[in-house]
């Protein structure tokens, strides 16, 4: 959900970050390394995709927003723009030094295929080993003029100070419930009570709210919450804790957005 957006105007919240990105694109003052720091489901991946799309767009508007119609935008929207590279990792919880060497260091020296920039998006960047981060240092210190690296993380605290000091940090704040509710009602075509419950459950993370709104588990979650609220006064503490844990477990299927 949400990844088919082709414009910053469609994003829920994060106006200050969008303004910063649009300004950088518009004035051509783009840094070589960014960290998008925010909780799971906060919208990091979407912002990174739109940032990359607008940097590569062949026909940007005066706000620095992507046109969504040129060849580059169409390629970016279907994830096959040759100069937007998403770094992957074999091991489930580690981005290794080999991943970084093969996918960034050895590749970044090759000029862009068809665009002004060559952009690397690194999801789960907090999984980079210390060796992987050290391997990146030289690249971040002396990047080619066309290179932009965007790290996505929910914990920027694990980066080495030498990496942090060379990146522009953009922190995603929780989005106000009312903003999420209005978005869900308009775009997911759901009634207000449904939208409010999704927004409350998402705790300021639009990506999570959108996934929840479309989730087949929604009715089940709703009845669990109502049951909990009705019985809360008569429940033993252990039962209460178990109920809350059950409700929180629905979160597992919400991938990062």
Regions found by a protein language model. Give the residues of each.
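Conserved catalytic/switch belt of AAA+ P-loop NTPases
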Residues: 134-151
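Clamp-loader machinery-focused feature within the broader ASCE/P-loop NTPase space
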Residues: 2-131
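Hydrophobic residues in beta-strands of the RecA-like P-loop NTPase core, especially within AAA+ ATPase
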Residues: 36, 122, 136-137, 153
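Charged, glycine-rich active-site and insertion segments that engage polyanionic ligands
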Residues: 5-54, 75, 145-146, 155-257
């Amino acid at each position: 959900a949400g990844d088919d957006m082709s414009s910053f105007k469609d994003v829920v919240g994060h106006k200050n970050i969008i303004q910063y990105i649009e300004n950088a694109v518009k004035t051509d003052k783009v840094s070589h390394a960014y960290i998008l720091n925010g909780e799971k489901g906060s919208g990091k991946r979407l912002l990174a995709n739109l940032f990359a799309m607008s940097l590569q767009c062949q026909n940007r508007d005066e706000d620095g927003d992507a046109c969504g119609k040129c060849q580059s935008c169409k390629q970016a929207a279907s994830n096959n723009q040759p100069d937007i590279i998403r770094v992957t990792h074999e091991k489930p919880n580690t981005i290794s030094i080999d991943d970084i060497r093969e996918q960034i260091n050895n590749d970044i020296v090759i000029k862009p295929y068809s665009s002004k920039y060559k952009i690397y998006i690194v999801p789960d960047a907090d999984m980079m080993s210390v060796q992987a981060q050290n391997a990146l240092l030289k690249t971040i210190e002396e990047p080619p003029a066309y290179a932009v690296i965007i790290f996505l993380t929910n914990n920027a605290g694990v980066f080495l100070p030498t990496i942090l000091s060379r990146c522009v940090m953009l922190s995603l704040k929780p989005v106000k419930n009312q903003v999420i509710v209005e978005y869900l009602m308009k775009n997911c075509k759901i009634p207000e009570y449904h939208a409010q419950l999704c927004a409350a459950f998402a705790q300021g993370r639009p990506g999570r709210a959108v996934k929840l709104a479309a989730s087949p588990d929604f009715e089940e979650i709703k009845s669990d919450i109502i049951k909990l609220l009705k019985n809360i006064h008569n429940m033993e503490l252990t039962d209460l804790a178990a109920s809350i844990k059950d409700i929180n477990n629905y979160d597992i299927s919400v991938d990062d957005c």
